[in-house]
Swiss-Prot record:
O-methyltransferase that catalyzes the conversion of catechol to guaiacol. Involved in the production of guaiacol in fruits. It comes from Solanum lycopersicum (Tomato). This is Cathecol O-methyltransferase 1. One of its GO terms (molecular function) is O-methyltransferase activity. Keywords: Methyltransferase, S-adenosyl-L-methionine, Transferase. One of its GO terms (biological process) is methylation. Disruption phenotype: Significant reduction of fruit guaiacol emissions. Its EC number is 2.1.1.-.
């Protein structure tokens, strides 16, 4: 009995220690995004990707690829940063014995880290991180507690205007936002086109909030028989370049939507003014938009929605944690914005007049859903 009791006490002590360690880690959890952002700014991921001669590089070798680096301690500092990234599986790390008790860490790209390398189109996840780490967004979090107690949107409390209006006042931030949206769209749309086959057999497709038309450019490049209508605010589409098979139409989605065999709405558009997507808006706004889409579709038409799905019950799974964090970003930045559960999407679709919702495939933690008329 005594032995069993001792084992139970030891197990409880180990559990308590693990819980305390996890709590301590959470205290410094803000370190990761700042270190990752700085590493991207230093082009570390691209340096590792370009060096074909070696599978892994030391911090000193990585620094040698930075022509503007003048700090003699740069390699030591960088090694400590890369150690953190390796502990989160953003990099692979090997320890090499140099002799006399001296070791050297060497780093290479991991499967996760490759998403921060610029692809053949120059796109990566890096610019989206730059947006989330920008002071304009970061400062909103300092108002979260008071927003809970007193009301209001944290972003508005800091800047005095809605997030949709702010870029007009800050050209530098506007560029950061636009770059984030362009890169995010390119990365996600490529994977959508690889996995989703619902564009086949469409004759006409309307992209609501399509910005400069890049979504339709990518879609019609793969499906050249589709006639695309890129729909956004007039001042947005007037700057859109010409693409084969794509017409640019200006208007307000809350008033009406152009007709087509299908309507496309993807999470994150090309500029803040163009973020006409469901997670940016309240249920009332979304319902109004979806009713307009319903009117614009033929009897066999569909709305193709690309959005995250937030489960009703919290979970420690990475997919759920990621969506829950995005939900808080919406709450902190956008009036009425939020991530929704599958049940909430079905309820909105039903109230707007749609007969059903099909969840087709999951891409980059976003679900491609079809709302059928």
């Amino acid at each position: 009995m005594g032995s069993t009791a001792n084992i139970q006490l030891a197990t409880q002590s180990e559990d308590e220690e693990r819980n305390c360690t996890y709590a301590m880690q959470l205290l410094s959890s803000s370190v990761l995004p700042f270190v990752l952002h700085s590493t991207i700014q230093l082009d570390v991921f691209d340096i590792l990707a370009k060096d074909k001669a070696a599978t892994k590089l030391s911090a000193l070798e990585i620094v040698s690829h930075m022509p503007n680096c003048k700090n003699p301690d740069a390699a030591t500092m960088l090694d400590r940063m890369l150690y953190v990234l390796a502990s989160y599986s953003l990099l692979d790390c090997s320890v090499v014995e140099e002799g006399n008790g001296v070791t050297e860490r060497r780093y290479g790209l991991s499967r996760v880290g490759k998403f921060f390398v610029r692809d053949e189109d120059g796109a990566s996840m890096g610019p989206l991180l730059a947006l989330l780490q920008d002071k304009v967004f970061i400062n909103s979090w300092f108002e979260l507690k008071d927003a809970v107690l007193e009301g209001g949107v944290p972003f508005d409390r800091v800047h005095g205007v809605h997030a949709f209006e702010y870029p007009k006042l800050d050209p530098k931030f506007n560029d950061v936002f636009n770059q984030a949206m362009i890169n995010h769209t390119t990365v996600v749309m490529k994977r959508i086109l690889e996995n989703y086959k619902g564009f086949e057999n469409l004759k006409t497709l309307v992209d609501v909030g399509g910005g400069l038309g890049v979504n339709l450019k990518m879609i019609t490049s793969k499906y050249p028989t589709i006639k695309g209508t890129n729909f956004d605010l007039p001042h947005v589409v007037q700057h859109a370049p010409s693409y084969p098979g794509v017409d640019h139409v200006g208007g307000d989605m809350f008033e009406s939507v152009p007709q087509g065999d299908a309507i496309f709405m993807k999470v994150m558009s090309k500029s803040l003014a163009e973020a006409w997507i469901l997670h940016d808006w309240s249920d009332g706004h979304c319902l109004k938009l979806l009713k307009n889409c319903h009117k614009a579709l033929p009897d066999n038409g569909k709305v193709i929605v690309v959005e995250a799905n937030l489960p009703v019950k919290p979970d420690t799974d990475t997919t759920v944690v990621g969506v829950s964090q995005c939900d808080l970003i919406m709450m902190a930045q956008n009036p009425g914005g939020k991530e929704r559960s599958e049940q909430e999407f079905r309820a909105l679709a039903s109230e707007a007049g749609f007969k059903g919702v099909n969840l087709i495939c999951c891409v980059c933690n976003f679900w491609v859903m079809e709302f059928y008329k």
